[in-house]
């Protein structure tokens, strides 16, 4: 019965997608309104769970959940998953046993059917983690020990495990299950809390780490996203999952500087809320759900391969909410602007319509 219901929901969703415009996507107000581009083959939802991590991948009616934030975020994640018309997860991936990643998984497992559970082996035995493992056993979910090189399919997409590459680390963050999700020409590298030690091992493995979208490790901490790793991934876009005014100072200024200096467009859940990336396998649209909207435009793989900066290609103009002045993306004034003050425009006309005046320095 569940599979029949899923099929009906999938058909209804596809019908709704056909009439959806980009303007519709930018005017969303709740998760259920994420009726995405009609030709999207893979949609990746970076769910806002505060200072934590939770990512939902969907393709052709099949779903993968990576982490679920702290324990008190379990219902938030469940509500979001169900709003996507999902009543069964093909895979749950627990990147590592830290509570800000796995705390909400017990609630997810108790509420939504799941086929497979993938994680790495550690000796961590907190009550939060043990409760998750007990739930996996109680609900008879197939347990899979993450092994680098293994590939799993869902819908029209797949993901490959790239890490961990050792069974012994001093820091639990480096046990993080790192996966590369792919759909035709577009790929996403999702790194959990993997830090430099794990990144160095991935670099040494010889695996292809390149990806169009990178979810920065450890909430944008300076302990992750090393220069060498960032060069190997060479992303057009980066996602940082962190909580507003968190106690750790995430994302760290070093990470933000690396992304900015390389022209990588980055998006933060603490300022944008839930962030959604949709791809048809040839291009990417980045959309936001929250207090601030991203002016989104689909960037083709061809443009990215030709060396276009994703930041400049998608959002050529950046406005300052305080001064009501808009700038070229490359203006020096943008580099010193507080992220929370930024609003993005893809045309000068949009900026003017919203009451923004041109910068006298860069003369956009």
What is the predicted role of each segment?
Residues 9, 13-17:
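Hydrophobic core
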Residues 7, 111, 354-355:
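Generic alpha-helical secondary-structure signal
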Residues 289-290, 295-364:
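Mature, structured domains enriched in cysteine- and short glycine motifs
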Residues 11, 177, 324:
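Residue-level detector of short, conserved catalytic/binding motifs and their immediate flanks
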Residues 2-4, 17-313, 335, 360:
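Non-globular, low-confidence helical/coil segments that flank catalytic cores
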